[in-house]
A protein has these predicted regions:
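Short, well-ordered beta-strand segments
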Residues: 42-44, 122
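Gly/Ser/Thr-rich phosphate-binding loop
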Residues: 2-6, 64, 90-94, 105-167
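Short beta->alpha linker loops
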Residues: 75-76, 97, 127
Length: 178
């Protein structure tokens, strides 16, 4: 049982069908091509694992052999920046609200932390306001990626920063095998 985020009301429990071994291999290959998860990479999971996206992302990070995973007991924008610097985090999955809260930090607070280790940041769970996404790309570089999906089916489309900059408002291309 995995729970929805509650965007349409209270979180709802959803049963997902398990894939066959071949289906799971294809899924892992597709996700790895998009997310570049694997050995030598380090991540922080700043969201609760009882929600679909962080739960699935965490499992994929383990299955794909990521070197380090840091779990945050609760999201705090400055704490996330501190942890990125401390652990030299390469990968991060967020939601737009986390971007908004980080951007609300005073500029001098944001500038205290070195986040240049980040190679790949992906957000999901809700549409990201275009001005917020642009500010994140300006701050962290063109490493901000986005996917759309649903608890019931997982990720279905993917969009990187360059695609978004060229086609604002796009939800990206359909992901194969998803």
């Amino acid at each position: 049982m995995i729970y929805t985020s509650g965007t349409t009301g209270r979180p709802k429990g959803v049963r997902r069908k398990s894939g066959t071994p071949d289906e799971m291999d294809n899924l892992y290959e597709t996700i790895n091509q998009a997310f570049d998860i694997g050995p030598g990479k380090r991540t922080i999971i700043p969201a609760p694992l009882y929600h679909s996206a962080p739960n699935t992302y965490g499992i994929l990070c383990v299955v794909m052999g990521m070197d380090e995973m840091v779990l945050m007991p609760r999201f705090d924008p400055e704490d996330l920046l501190r942890l990125i610097e401390k652990h030299k985090t390469t990968h991060l999955q967020t939601v737009p609200t986390m971007f908004i809260r980080m951007l609300k930090l005073p500029e001098e607070e944001r500038a205290k932390y070195i986040v240049s280790s980040l190679e790949f940041v992906v957000h999901a769970a809700a549409p990201c306001p275009p001005d917020i996404k642009q500010q994140m790309i300006d701050w962290w570089g063109p490493i901000i990626n986005e996917y759309y999906g649903a608890t019931e089916v997982g990720a279905v489309s993917f969009l990187d920063s360059n695609q978004w900059l060229g086609h604002r408002g796009s939800v990206g291309e359909a992901m194969k095998n998803c």
